[in-house]
Amino acid sequence: MSYLVAHPLRVLACLIAMACGARAEEAKEATSTADQSKVTVGATLMSDYIYRGISYSAHQPSVAAYVDAQQGWLYGYTNFNSVKFSTSPAVEVTVAAGIRPTLGPFEFDIGAAYYYYPGEQGPDLSNYWEAHATLSHKVTDKLSWGPTIAYAPDVWQSGAWGVYGAGTLAYELPSEFLPTGLTWSLSLDFGRWLFGPTSGAGGVSAAGGGLALPAFNNWHAGLKFSYQVFKLGLNYTDTSLSKENCYVLTGDLGATPGGVANPGDNPLGLRSRLCGATFSATLGFEFNPLTLGR
């Protein structure tokens, strides 16, 4: 596994130096160009990189760096995240683009993302793209909720389509008793990922051709603390996947025998621990470089 840590950490160090020079609160946009434009630069250290309930870092620390640029409704987003897959990619690169219109208390995000895993070992690759639509409804100044739907025609190049649906509820908790400038919020998520039959081995999946990848539910509860440009997250995640189906879905190289064998997709009864209940923490920052020095 080429587990990319050194280069993201260098990026992280440079971004922290920039963030520390930012103002405690971003100034209001001073020009019409700034009014229409927004750029967010950030980085995050994670005790475990969890995506839809599955550990993408094999329950090891991970680091991410990202840039999000928006002009009016249009936006583009790029994220680099260290991962640990069975195909040993150097890093996960996510490139997304779309529109984010606002209608009263409703905010929309409609776009597509491409997940790229350079440096994978073996003949099977995991790169794929996914279209998504998200709605966020701000019920009050502190309470918001919204659904998400996403579709991928070929998840991990396995030949299987994937449809993901989720709902999110977020609430900003009272902060009067906290130090000045410190806020905290609670978020709850529940999602379900459905898959079609595979046509090949796929990049990370252990499922053979013609077999459907195991569908599953996932859920998350998190607390996020924010102070100026810095953010701390405490998270609990879990899925409905059995350890045997977790192996089928992830192809985990650290899977162990002793489970229930399935002649179709898991004849050895291998068990993976990448999809179970997990507590994790994140520490990061984000800021708008367009407002530096204002």
Regions found by a protein language model. Give the residues of each.
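Short loop/turn motifs that connect adjacent beta-strands in outer-membrane beta-barrel proteins
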Residues: 25-38, 87, 102-107, 123, ...
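Short glycine/proline- and aromatic-enriched beta-strand/turn motifs that initiate or cap beta-hairpins
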Residues: 27-84, 288
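Residues that define the transmembrane beta-barrel architecture of outer-membrane proteins
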Residues: 37, 59-63, 89-93, 106, ...
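Transmembrane beta-strands of outer-membrane beta-barrel proteins
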Residues: 39-43, 65, 72-78, 95, ...
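Transmembrane beta-strands of outer-membrane beta-barrel pores
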Residues: 45-51, 71-73, 80-84, 101, ...
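Detector for outer-membrane/organellar transmembrane beta-barrel domains
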Residues: 128-211, 236, 289, 293-294
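Outer-membrane beta-barrel "beta-signal"
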Residues: 171, 227-230, 256-257, 261, ...
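Solvent-exposed loop segments that connect transmembrane elements
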Residues: 196-212, 243-271
